[in-house]
Amino acid sequence: MPFVNIRLVEGRSQQRKDEISKRVTAAISEVLQLPKDDIWVVFEDVPAGDWHVGSTTVAKLRKKAQK
């Protein structure tokens, strides 16, 4: 039973997560020839202040990009 853990910076809508889950599940089902009900997808929302790119938080990068 495949378990897919997707980590994203928080802020994505439930609708967007549902679409990602649908597509990931379909791809794994097709490639591994498994029923879709055997595939688990979990989302982890990470606060922008806890996600670092290099040594800078995503929160700071977003603020910088808005200037």
Where are these regions (language model features)?
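A domain-level signal for the structural core that forms small-molecule/cofactor-binding pockets
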Residues: P2-K67
